Each structure stands twice: as structure tokens, then as C-alpha cells.
């Protein structure tokens, strides 16, 4: 089980990223647009640097919904591999069966 503080930190990052998503996308588009002048692009880069560090969506980490484990998390289920195994064997995940070939 992950510490509560780490899970709360991730939730805080999600909220910040959602809050600044439009501004971040706008500045990112300007900074990467080759048709814009160098001054505009530089101003956009400076604007990106002034945003909070945690507003960047790449700083978010996928965590297991149950345990909070940051590694071995499957996006499709939102669960860590160990929890997927437990729940699949218990029959709690519909459509998931043990492989046999």
C-alpha cells in the first residue's frame, strides 16, 4: 500500500494539470509553430516555464486504484498486476480468464 501522502500528491498534480491544460496547450502550440516569429516562440517558452511544474501532464504517474502502487499498472484496468491477478482468479473482473493453450 502506497503512503497516503504520495497518492494525495498525484491527485494534486491531476488537478493542477486540468486547471492549466488549456493554457499549457496554447503555449505549447505557439512554441512549436515554425511559422511564428522567434520572439513569439521565445515568449511562449518563457510562459511555459512560468507555469507551475506540476501543471505539466508528463509529471503524472499512473497508480493502482486500490493499492496506489506506481509500477506495473495496467491502463486498461487501472490496477496493478498483482491486484489484477487476485481479482481475475476470484472472478471479479468480467471477461478475464486464465490463459490456456
Swiss-Prot record:
Compositional bias of kind Basic and acidic residues: 33-44
A GO molecular-function descriptor: structural constituent of ribosome
Keyword Ribosomal protein appears in the UniProt entry: yes
A Pfam family of this chain: Ribosomal_S14
InterPro entries (UniProt xref): Ribosomal_uS14, Ribosomal_uS14_bac/plastid
Gene3D superfamilies linked to this entry: 1.10.287.1480
Sorted UniProt keywords: Ribonucleoprotein, Ribosomal protein, RNA-binding, rRNA-binding
GO cellular component: cytoplasm; small ribosomal subunit
Disordered: annotated span: 32-67
Gene Ontology BP terms: translation
Keyword presence, ATP-binding: no
SUPFAM superfamilies in alphabetical order: Glucocorticoid receptor-like (DNA-binding domain) (SSF57716)
Domain of life: Bacteria
Record function comment: Binds 16S rRNA, required for the assembly of 30S particles and may also be responsible for determining the conformation of the 16S rRNA at the A site.
Similarity-based family: Belongs to the universal ribosomal protein uS14 family.
Subunit structure: Part of the 30S ribosomal subunit. Contacts proteins S3 and S10.
Protein name (database record): Small ribosomal subunit protein uS14
Organism: Paracidovorax citrulli (strain AAC00-1)
Organismal lineage: Bacteria, Pseudomonadati, Pseudomonadota, Betaproteobacteria, Burkholderiales
Amino acid at each position: 500500500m502506497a503512503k497516503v501522502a504520495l497518492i494525495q500528491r498525484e491527485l494534486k498534480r491531476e488537478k493542477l494539470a486540468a486547471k492549466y491544460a488549456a493554457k499549457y496547450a496554447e503555449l505549447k502550440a505557439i512554441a512549436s509553430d515554425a511559422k511564428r516569429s522567434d520572439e513569439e516562440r521565445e515568449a511562449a517558452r518563457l510562459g511555459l516555464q512560468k507555469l507551475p511544474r506540476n501543471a505539466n501532464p508528463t509529471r503524472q504517474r499512473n497508480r493502482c486504484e486500490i493499492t496506489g502502487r506506481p509500477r506495473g499498472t495496467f491502463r486498461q484496468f487501472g490496477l496493478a498486476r498483482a491486484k489484477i491477478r487476485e481479482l481475475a482468479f476470484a472472478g471479479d473482473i468480467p471477461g478475464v480468464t486464465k490463459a490456456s493453450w
